[in-house]
């Protein structure tokens, strides 16, 4: 069909997987209820029964992507393998499900409107009046139905029911259910049931009102996940089910847990898969939840603790280092130790901050604020023999510190922070311009030098890691650094871009220009994080 066919059905979308089943996750009452984790948890249950799962996130906000959004407002920016800056929920999906997502799996309202307006300018609509329905709604549906070779597509709709920006997204998924058939779509709604200490009551009215607002948009929820500090009683589930037009068994207690990897187990105990299977007419299969049970057992075990100091500047927002803290947790599982994190403010850093830590990690970041503290942290780790891991900017500050204090280049710096310095870190060619979309983004290959710590860590001579940066170490100084004891142990295949530096004579001092946290798994960890935590355990104070 042509783009100006006014109310075309998504069935006609070229390449759409009409055999897939779709689960839409929406939220109400308040934001930050954990829709992303709920989506990942439902997907994990499906995978445990042998079904393949893909995941997508739709954010109604008007930014084209999260790339230039402040970590203080939005948390971390997650980078996909194909170089797209996405919402952090994609990290949950990839970690829980072990899938590789792409730029078409994180879609914002701004991107939708950008697409529609550009299509209008190109003349794709042949002079038609461009409207929210059908043009914007059709574009949303095209992203929902983008080809995937999977049994299920789990789509999270960001925000809450009632948000102005989100209304067109709710309208689009309502239409989509009609287009592909209601039995091929399931609507799961997250709500909140607050507990009032004064009266000792769990209040269900906010949930009832949220479901009613969803109904105003033409969507009947098929299952509710009610965030609550305790399990709902049978009477409470029956009451919610009656007012929300569903069986009581479809009302799930979204209880608070001390670790998100317990959520699939909590859902499994409440027969969430059975509800999904009944809705879609699937056979009721037994699931294998062994890998999540293993994590639960690890959490309960009495194990030694390794203390890692993270020297950063975005600690005011818990989600700013979400993938990083997850990767350290994963490494703890692999090393059979508990990892305790100490948040160290780079802006007020003092060497005494590291006196009680077993390892120092300096993560990525942008801008000059806090850089001096990060350089001082690298100096502390280098001179005291404390295991050090640097990520992105964490590699750059390690290079700057070494240049200043070992090579004697007193004004060594990055041109990002001082245009008049002696640059040991410089901007990459072709990466100037607007802040958005001009970084070196996504997965790039890296060749590792044999007989180095990096080679020992990875066990191979070629790796692929995800990047998000525009500054690099000046490779023309490689010999000068190597002669003094800091070597480049990983570089781009053409040899031009340093990717890993290390100190061979240090207990553990390894830094990468990439972001290994984006490829860490709760079931296998990541080689660099695993090695770092192992070194911290070995050097434990």
Task: Place the predicted regions along the sequence by residue.
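C-terminal and late-domain segments of enzyme folds
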Residues: 450-541
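Extended hydrophobic-aromatic, low-complexity segments
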Residues: 317-321, 333-337, 351-353, 369-373, ...
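Active-site proximal loops enriched in glycine and acidic residues that flank catalytic Cys/His/Asp
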Residues: 27, 57, 228, 255, ...
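Flexible phosphate-sensing "switch/lid" loops adjacent to ATP/NTP-binding sites
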Residues: 17-341, 347-359, 366-367, 373-380, ...
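A generic structural signal for well-ordered coil/turn residues at beta-strand boundaries
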Residues: 220, 247, 304, 356, ...
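Cysteine-nucleophile active-site neighborhood
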Residues: 36, 40-44, 48, 356-445, ...
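Short, Lys/Arg-enriched N-terminal segments with co-localized hydrophobic residues
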Residues: 5-18
């Amino acid at each position: 069909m042509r783009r100006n066919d006014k109310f075309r059905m998504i069935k006609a979308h070229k390449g759409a997987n009409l055999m897939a089943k779709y689960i839409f996750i929406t939220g109400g009452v308040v934001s930050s209820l954990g829709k992303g984790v709920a989506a990942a948890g439902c997907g994990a249950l499906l995978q445990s029964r042998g079904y393949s799962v893909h995941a997508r996130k739709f954010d109604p906000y008007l930014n084209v992507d999260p790339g230039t959004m402040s970590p203080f407002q939005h948390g971390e920016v997650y980078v996909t393998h194909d170089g797209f800056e996405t919402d952090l929920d994609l990290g949950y999906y990839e970690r829980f499900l072990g899938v590789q997502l792409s730029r078409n799996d994180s879609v914002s309202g701004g991107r939708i409107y950008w697409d529609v307006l550009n299509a209008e300018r190109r003349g794709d609509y042949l002079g038609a009046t461009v409207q929210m329905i059908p043009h914007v709604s059709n574009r949303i549906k095209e992203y929902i139905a983008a080809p995937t070779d999977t049994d299920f597509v789990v789509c999270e709709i960001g925000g809450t029911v009632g948000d102005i920006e989100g209304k067109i997204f709710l309208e689009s998924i309502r239409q989509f259910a009609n287009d592909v058939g209601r039995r091929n779509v399931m609507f799961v709604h997250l709500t909140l049931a607050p507990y009032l200490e004064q009266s000792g009551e769990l209040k269900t009215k906010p949930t009832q009102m949220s479901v009613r607002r969803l109904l105003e948009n033409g969507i009947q929820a098929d299952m509710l996940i009610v965030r609550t500090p305790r399990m709902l009683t049978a009477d409470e589930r029956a009451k919610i089910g009656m007012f929300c037009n569903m069986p009581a068994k479809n009302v799930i207690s979204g209880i608070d847990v001390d670790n998100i990897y317990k959520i699939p187990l909590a859902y499994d105990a409440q027969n969430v898969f059975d509800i999904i299977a009944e809705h879609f007419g699937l056979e009721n299969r037994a699931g294998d939840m062994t890998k999540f049970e293993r994590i639960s057992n690890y959490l309960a075990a009495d194990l030694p603790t390794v203390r890692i100091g993270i020297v950063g500047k975005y600690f005011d927002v818990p989600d700013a280092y979400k993938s990083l803290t997850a990767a350290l947790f994963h490494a703890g599982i692999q090393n059979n130790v508990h990892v305790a994190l100490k948040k160290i403010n780079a802006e007020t850093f003092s060497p005494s901050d590291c006196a009680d830590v077993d390892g120092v990690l300096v993560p990525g970041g942008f801008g000059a604020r806090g850089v001096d503290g990060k350089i001082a942290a690298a100096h502390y780790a280098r001179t005291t023999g404390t295991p050090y891991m640097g990520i992105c900017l964490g590699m750059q500050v390690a290079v700057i510190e070494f240049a200043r204090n070992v090579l004697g280049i007193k004004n060594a710096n990055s041109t990002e922070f001082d245009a008049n310095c002696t640059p040991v870190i410089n901007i990459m060619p072709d990466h100037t311009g607007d802040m958005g979309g001009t970084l070196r983004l996504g997965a790039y290959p890296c060749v590792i030098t044999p007989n180095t710590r990096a080679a020992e860590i990875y066990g191979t001579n070629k790796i692929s890691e995800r990047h998000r940066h525009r500054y690099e170490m000046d490779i023309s100084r490689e010999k000068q650094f190597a002669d003094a004891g800091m070597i480049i142990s990983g570089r781009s295949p053409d040899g031009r871009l340093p990717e890993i530096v290390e100190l061979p004579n240090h207990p553990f001092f390894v830094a990468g220009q990439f972001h290994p946290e984006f490829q860490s798994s709760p079931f296998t960890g990541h080689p660099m994080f695993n090695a770092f935590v192992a070194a911290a355990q070995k050097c434990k104070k």
